[in-house]
Amino acid sequence: MRKIISLFFAIFLTLSSVQAENVTKTINSLINKDAVSVSVKDISNNKEVYSLNKKAPMIPASTLKLVTSSAALNTLGSDYEFSTKLYKSSNNDLYLKLGADPFLTSSDLKKMMTVAKEKNILEPKNIYIDSSIFDNVEWGEGWQWDDEMNPLMPKFSAYNIDENLLNIEITPSMQNMPPSIVVKPFYPLTFMNLITTDITLSKNDISIVKNLNFAQNVYDAKGEITKIENIKMPIPNLQRYFKLRLDDVINAQKIDYNKGYPNAILPTKNIYLVTSVAHKMPDAMESILKTSNNLVAETVFKLAGAKWAEEKGSISNSLGMLKFYISSLNIPTDDVKIVDGSG
């Protein structure tokens, strides 16, 4: 996949001199040309500069990020910030306004509640969460049920936090005995622990799969282990995980509150900003285009759709934004079907 992305960057750079033969050389040096379908046009005059198997249908995979991230960047702007804000009302209520920040961490929540405590906010009447920036769809069209164990494809929502991944720490015990399995930080999962400790092995051979015969959040852990192993897996319920981490930081700051976190829209009057955390667009573009991060790509795509439509983020708004952007470049889209932001 990195070769494919490198290929397209090379094509774009080559086009500055409009030398089709260099494009051909680049393609032949990087990948098997029979596996490529590409058409390169000069957008200033819509003339084709180079093509190869241009009518062959192909799944773009993560090369799609070049298109969707360009449209999103054009819509949001390079100075866009992913922000999470904490407000206080005159009624002593707190409002946590989520911005679907794909870089938000539990440490960021801790910083926010530390500031709240420093401002003597010790006994809030209620703590509300405003998650209205996105709809409730957390996966892209075509994502499969068995993708939910893939750490490269976590769910994404207004409640993005900690890369939307759990860390499962598996620690061997005595020979032929089951290891300990701990979720750090805590999240309620049940494991059917069928792993055996074998100190004679040179490496671990472990698998964790969802058990479809029992209730949700039950997993089969199988294999053999000889040393500590940490496994990343997507968070099953982002909202639940987020609220657990919010509990952690509120309790750590000794803020007196135990009433839950109902959803509510941030009021427009009688509130003031307590504190906020933010991350910048260049970090997102680097994450999308250098490491092909699906979580960041999907989040940015959905945020751009929200801004373009001036309403809640949804895939339909994102696709509308994308079509508008591509049309502005005089590129026909009649034969193109795009269903998500990451490919």
Regions found by a protein language model. Give the residues of each.
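N-terminal post-signal-peptidase region of extra-cytosolic proteins
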Residues: 53, 109-114, 340-341
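Conserved serine DD-peptidase/penicillin-binding transpeptidase domain
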Residues: 76-333
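Beta-lactamase-like hydrolase cores
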Residues: 18-57, 76-82, 115-123
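Positively charged n-region of N-terminal signal peptides that target proteins for export
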Residues: 1-4
